[in-house]
Amino acid sequence: MAEKRKYEPLKIEKKWQEIWDKNEEFEPKDDLSLPKKYILSMFPYPSGRIHMGHVRNYSIGDALARSYRKSGYNVLHPIGFDSFGMPAENAAIKHKIHPKIWTYENIDYMKKELASLGFSFSKKRILATSDPLYTKWEQSFFIKMFEKGLVYRKNAIVNWCEYDQTVLANEQVEDGKCWRCGNDVVQKELPGYYFNITKYASELLDDLKLLEGKWPNQVITMQENWIGRSYGLEFKFSLDEASKETLGGKFDGFEVFTTRPDTIYGVSYTALAPEHPIVKALLESDKFDENKKAKIKAILNQSPRERQASDKDGEFLGIYVVHPLTNEKIPVWVANFILADYGSGAIMAVPAHDQRDFEFASKFNLPIKPVVKPLEGESEGSKAYSEYGVAINSELINGLSSEDAKSFIIEKFEKDGLGKRITNYKLRDWGISRQRYWGAPIPVVHCKCCGVVPEKEENLPIALPEDVEITGEGNPLDKHPTWKFTKCPKCGKDAIRETDTMDTFVESSWYFARFASDEKTWEQKALDEKSVNYWMNVDQYIGGIEHAILHLLYARFFQKVLRDLGYLRDDEPFENLLTQGMVLKDGKKMSKSKGNVVDPDDIINRYGADTARLFILFAAPPQKELEWNDSAVEGAFRFLNRLWEKSQTIKKIDKLPEIDHESLNKDEKFARLKIYEALKKSTEVFGDTFAFNTLIAACMEALNAINAQDNDDVNAEGFFIILNLLEPIVPHIANELSEELFGRKNFTKIAVKEEVFVKDSIALAVTVNGKKRAEFEVTASENESEILKQAKQNVAKWLEGKEILKEIYIKGKLVNFVIKG
């Protein structure tokens, strides 16, 4: 008897990883007539080590990619590295190492880690966004967007992180803090470059309908709220004559936007953001005493988070506007709750019908005039009534519903030339300027003669100088002795190169299209039209929900821009989106600071990659949080050992055996039932639910059922199918056992055999005088007299000594005995 082989995961995993690499089994085929699937997991930042969140993300994507390959699809499953960014500079300061060296050493290490898990990535299309070629084409996109008016430069109040010494986009500020370092964000006026994402606001919002049922509702809702479309009236409050004089004739009024023009008669004050030009002019004048100036400057210096957390506060500015309908004088205040970048940074305040306005008016004893009556009952005086109702105390619209009153006021203002109906968005243009070294240089120069001039395409890429000192103070590019000095591409005179680099979210906004472009064309063009339009859009995208209004919104914007520039065809980049849950330990997100990190390398070295993958996909549905459990990891390892041991009892075959199902005994039939139930389950899991935990459970049940009988053909058939189903999940052991037993001929699409689901017997209920007393199994071949005989035996104690008045048999359902007494 041959000696049993021991399951040695590290040995077989290394073997199969080498075979896959040698045979280039995971490279997409050049035949673009084949049906395709593009499976993409969000690429990692090269921090130096992969973590369990990465393992989960890439295990999900890999299972799908492998499944589609078996089903005959041409599959693109790429990986790369989002390799620009501030952590590299922070590491340079801490470890005295150049950001480029730190980044690429980390990439090399992470490539090995990812390979050790057996992920079926295309190795020919691996990219890093800090590669010069990637920078070249990104800079080319920037220039084309600049020429189309989709990029512009302006001075603006920006979100500034003192710790990272850089500008942040609105989306990168979370509760007033920097999304990356967690420190407070302050407001600062700086020149910078902006992507005109608001030009696409309507399309970005409307096209979310295309994603319904394909993206999580939560992500769609978050983007809807972030884009924030609202309809209303924009009009101008004119300053009274005395106020114009106070401001030296520089201003005659200011624009406001309101979504509730039906409440215009309830305006008791107006309020400006602290950054408003009128406030700035007054601060620079001699009209304010020092105490008032100090208070306003204190508000200006507060971070958005501090302003939001503070009580409503402000100052009367000593000026008035004229109400456009009543000609009343309305006081103008500066208020800490007004956002400079929403609308015009000014509001009409209606304290009776807006809670923020109410709180401010209550604090400063300003009038509160109700102009909307609730449809039922009365409004409370202790808070604002913000719902719709009927107009009151409003001369021209009394008695009208809020909807009709809105329409009336808008029409009147438009007719009289006082204002206009507009659509407004909360979404702001994307500020991309960053005062950091390790990013893609913005490809423009500043010329005294020509102004801001984009670089010539033939000069790209504008590469970073490598002889820099990273100290954390200021911008290394600005301080470099030679790099920024250049010639103007337009006139040839001396010019200064732009020293800001692009926000790293720019890189991740188009990488999916670069992956879809044939790598043989990467030198010659940004995107190869033929291959990109074959592969795009991404069939399944996988990543964390934390990217809902950052990366996912920017990527949708870039897709539309590249479509309009003629590079892409589709309106949306990602057909389907799966947002996987976090991996927790002890109920908390894994982090070094909490001391609860599990190193994937440790798990692989102890149990093998297949055990890590099996546990990750079995422990919870992908959309749910996953709690790390050491004993469950042990359980996954034991299952693979049982699979290995069972394989040594299986006969070798190269196709499914022909089995006469009717000739099998009960246990053999049950085993086949469980085998094909698992096969059916796989269609549902890989095609729809991604509930890999249910498929793994079905395979475990099937293995148990196989072990409970000893038919060689059923064993072989079952193992043939189980290895097929498990291959996307635990590919190393599945390939090893399949090669040994089936020559890997079972890794193809297998048809379900419906005969195994035909029931040989049915359960009949037995009732006595309509009350259920028993249940028993009968075969389809048994006749009525045999069934009645068995039924009597099953309820004998209830029939004993009784007269049976009637015997009723309802075929396939029940037997009822009607007895006397």
Swiss-Prot record:
Disulfide cross-links: none
GO MF term list: aminoacyl-tRNA deacylase activity; ATP binding; leucine-tRNA ligase activity
Residue interval(s) of motif 'HIGH' region: 44-54
Location relative to the cell: Cytoplasm
Record-listed E.C. numbers: 6.1.1.4
Motif annotated as 'KMSKS' region, chain positions: 589-593
Entry-linked InterPro entries: aa-tRNA-synth_I_CS (IPR001412), Leu-tRNA-ligase (IPR002302), Leu_tRNA-synth_edit (IPR025709), M/V/L/I-tRNA-synth_anticd-bd (IPR013155), Methionyl/Leucyl_tRNA_Synth (IPR015413), Rossmann-like_a/b/a_fold (IPR014729), tRNAsynth_Ia_anticodon-bd (IPR009080), Val/Leu/Ile-tRNA-synth_edit (IPR009008)
Catalytic activity field: tRNA(Leu) + L-leucine + ATP = L-leucyl-tRNA(Leu) + AMP + diphosphate
BP GO annotations: leucyl-tRNA aminoacylation
Major localization listed first in the record, in broad terms: cytoplasm
Cellular component GO terms, alphabetical: cytosol
Enzyme type, top EC level: ligase
Keywords (A to Z) from UniProt: Aminoacyl-tRNA synthetase, ATP-binding, Cytoplasm, Ligase, Nucleotide-binding, Protein biosynthesis
Pfam families given in the database record: Anticodon_1, tRNA-synt_1_2, tRNA-synt_1g
Binding site for ATP: K592
Keyword Cytoplasm attached: yes
NCBIfam families xrefs: leuS_bact (TIGR00396)
Annotated family: Belongs to the class-I aminoacyl-tRNA synthetase family.
Protein name (Swiss-Prot/TrEMBL): Leucine--tRNA ligase
Organism: Campylobacter concisus (strain 13826)
